[in-house]
């Protein structure tokens, strides 16, 4: 969803949307509700490059869904942070499973239900910001910025948005 458009300023092209992430498997699920296959109607084309980060010193980080490419990109900045990156991804899978799979379709309109979620949300470090959680796993400042950017996609600030939003990092991989 969102503002599917681009605009140009000088030699740069900016993406003006869409701003909401929708995983392809959710479209497949929607079509299956009507006993249809999405592939008969739409071709979903995977992108080789999802984002390119350009830092003020000219260094770039090409963010993609390809694990080998991601390993090379992370190691370009910090060999030791590759293990931290993998640990971060593994932790965000737990956040995804709770925050997206278990809770995204549940109404939080009952105090008892909300209170029952507190222990698991605490164990998932939901009290931390996205940037703070990423910093537990990644030491290189540029890599911290790369892996903290996901709240920006939904209008959030990585320094203040709850770390539950790191589930987007894992959602992208599904």
Residue ranges and their predicted role:
Residues 1-94:
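N-terminal glycine-rich phosphate/pyrophosphate-binding loop and immediately adjacent elements
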Residues 10, 26, 156-174:
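Residues forming the flavin
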Residues 12-13, 114-117, 174:
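A short, structure-level motif marking secondary-structure boundaries and short turns
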Residues 38-39, 108, 167-170:
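Short, intrinsically disordered/low-complexity patches at protein termini
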């Amino acid at each position: 969803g969102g503002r599917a458009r681009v605009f140009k300023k000088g030699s740069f092209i900016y993406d003006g949307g869409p701003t909401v992430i929708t995983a392809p498997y959710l479209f497949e699920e929607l079509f299956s509700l009507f006993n249809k296959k999405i592939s008969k109607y739409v071709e979903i084309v995977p992108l080789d490059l999802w984002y390119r980060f350009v830092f003020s010193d000219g260094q770039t980080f090409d963010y993609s869904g390809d694990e080998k490419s991601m390993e090379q990109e992370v190691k370009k900045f910090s060999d030791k942070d590759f293990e931290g990156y993998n640990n971060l991804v593994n932790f965000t899978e737990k956040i995804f499973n709770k925050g997206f799979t278990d809770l995204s379709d549940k109404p939080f309109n009952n105090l008892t239900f909300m209170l029952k979620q507190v222990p698991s949300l605490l164990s998932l470090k939901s009290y931390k910001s996205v940037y703070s959680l990423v910093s537990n796993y990644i030491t290189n400042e540029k890599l911290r910025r790369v892996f903290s950017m996901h709240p920006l996609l939904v209008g959030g600030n990585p320094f203040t948005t709850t770390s539950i939003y790191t589930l987007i990092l894992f959602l992208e991989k599904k």
